[in-house]
Design a protein with these regions (language model features):
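Hydrophobic alpha-helical segments of small multi-pass membrane proteins
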Residues: 95-97, 110
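Short, cysteine/histidine-rich loop/knuckle motifs that typically chelate Zn2+
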Residues: 92-93, 113
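Interaction interfaces in information-processing and related assembly proteins
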Residues: 1-84, 122
Length: 122
C-alpha cells in the first residue's frame, strides 16, 4: 500500500513518486547490506584456509558484520513503516520528517531536531 502523505508544505510532503523513489533506494540498500554480510561471512573462511587470519582481522570482521546487520535492520524497519503507513513520521515528536532528510537518510526514524536531542543524550 502506498501512502500519499500530505503534511502541509513541500519540505515535508511525500508524493507517491517520492515514496516510490525512497522505497527503491531502501530495496537497493537492503540488497547491498545482505551481500555485504555474505562477503563478510565468507572472508574469514578464505583467510583461515590460507592460515592468515589475525585477531585484529577477526575483530574488524565482527564489527563490520554488526554494523551491516544494524543498518539492514534499520532499512527493513523503514520498509515496514512504508507498508504500514507510518513512514516519514518521527518516532519521538510524531511530526513529519523533512523530505530532504529522508532523501539523505531514507531509513531515518527521527526528525533532525529529535535526532540531535538523542545524540546529545548519549
Amino acid at each position: 500500500m502506498v501512502n500519499h502523505q500530505t503534511v502541509g508544505d513541500r519540505a515535508t510532503h511525500l508524493s507517491p513518486e517520492d515514496l516510490a523513489a525512497l522505497r527503491e533506494i531502501l530495496h537497493e540498500q537492503r540488497l547491498f547490506r545482505q551481500d555485504q554480510l555474505r562477503q563478510i561471512a565468507a572472508a574469514p573462511r578464505a583467510e583461515e584456509l590460507l592460515g592468515r587470519r589475525s585477531a585484529a582481522q577477526a575483530e574488524v570482521h565482527v564489527k563490520l558484520a554488526a554494523s551491516a546487520r544494524m543498518v539492514l535492520a534499520d532499512v527493513e524497519a523503514a520498509l515496514q513503516r512504508m507498508a504500514d503507513g507510518s513512514y516519514g513520521t518521527c518516532h519521538l515528536c510524531r511530526r513529519a520528517i523533512d523530505r530532504e532528510r529522508l532523501t539523505i537518510v531514507p531509513q531515518a526514524r527521527y526528525c533532525a531536531r529529535c535526532q540531535q536531542v538523542r545524540e546529545a543524550g548519549r
